[in-house]
UniProtKB/Swiss-Prot annotation:
The gene is NSMCE1. This is Non-structural maintenance of chromosomes element 1 homolog. The lineage of its organism: Eukaryota, Metazoa, Chordata, Craniata, Vertebrata. Keywords: Chromosome, DNA damage, DNA recombination, DNA repair, Metal-binding, Nucleus, Telomere, Transferase, Ubl conjugation, Ubl conjugation pathway, Zinc, Zinc-finger. It catalyses: S-ubiquitinyl-[E2 ubiquitin-conjugating enzyme]-L-cysteine + [acceptor protein]-L-lysine = [E2 ubiquitin-conjugating enzyme]-L-cysteine + N(6)-ubiquitinyl-[acceptor protein]-L-lysine. Its main location: nucleus. PANTHER family: NON-SMC ELEMENT 1-RELATED, NON-STRUCTURAL MAINTENANCE OF CHROMOSOMES ELEMENT 1 HOMOLOG. It comes from Bos taurus.
């Protein structure tokens, strides 16, 4: 997350090109954001020293502030990869997606979102989502059409699909954090470690506190026998590995080559 105190800077052609390209993507992993920044310097100011990414983004955010837009930093819930998304702060509703989707498509997203938030796992099956098609507002939608719309949500990085089930993409979590907290106050889950919104993660079987998988990994990094940070009972779940960009670079792994694994709350 960006801090509240920002250094007011002056937007150059480098910043403007970066912002324009980020807008076309909506959300990018940090490694891609750094590559994008270097590309923009190469195109517009190849002799300049590449500014520290945090300062570079703060300069852009200081200009975007009056437009109620912000480049926000978050992490993916499944493996803790840093991501950056261009977030619209002017509205806290699903209507911020309105320029890309029709009314009945937005309502389908709301239905999927509600199922995801209400679930214990952070996932909603395609079957359960499609069963709600008859309840959609606006133009009638067939199940085949709804399947296509769900794939559009995936392509636009609002949802992630794993083994026929859907969960929220990091972009959706960054964009809709406030909306989710206000709309589903009784169902919303918060990580015991970072206090951020939690969709998928692990939970203590004794006291019920929940933790993001990356937070689990970091908290228990040096523990041979992990115990709950709240009640001190034994933590029975498998502790995932912490995302390490250097290690990933060395092994030459890319996310596209990884077989997606199911991240479940327990």
């Amino acid at each position: 997350m960006q801090g509240n105190t920002r250094r007011t800077g002056v937007m150059t052609d480098v910043h403007r090109r970066f912002l324009q390209l980020l807008m076309t993507h909506g959300v990018l992993e940090e490694c891609d954001v750094k590559r994008l920044q270097k590309h923009c310097y190469k195109v517009h100011d190849c002799n300049a020293t590449v500014e520290k990414l945090e300062d570079f983004i703060n300069t852009i955010n200081s200009v975007l502030e009056s437009l109620y837009i912000e480049i926000k930093k978050g992490v993916t819930e499944d493996d803790g990869r840093p991501i950056y998304a261009l977030v619209n702060l002017a509205t806290t509703s699903v209507s911020k997606m309105a320029s890309d989707f029709a009314e009945n498509e937005l309502d389908l997203f709301r239905k999927a979102l509600e199922l995801i938030i209400d679930s214990d796992t952070g996932f909603a099956s395609s079957t359960n989502i499609l069963n709600l098609v008859d309840q959609l507002k606006g133009k009638k939608m067939r199940k085949k059409e709804a399947e296509h719309v769900l794939q559009k949500f995936v392509q636009n990085k609002w949802l992630i699909e794993k083994e026929g089930e859907f969960t929220l993409h990091g972009r959706a979590i960054l964009e809709m954090d406030q909306y989710i907290r206000e709309t589903y106050p009784d169902a919303v889950k918060v990580c015991n470690i970072c206090r951020s919104l939690l969709i998928q993660g692990q939970s203590c079987e004794t006291c019920g506190i929940r933790m993001h998988l990356p937070c689990v990994a970091k908290y228990f990094q040096s523990s041979s026998e992990p115990h709950c940070p709240h009640c001190n009972d034994y933590w029975p779940h498998e502790v995932p590995e912490v995302f390490d960009p250097e290690k990933e670079r060395e092994t030459g792994m890319s996310r596209s080559n990884k077989r997606p694994s199911r991240s479940r709350q327990h």
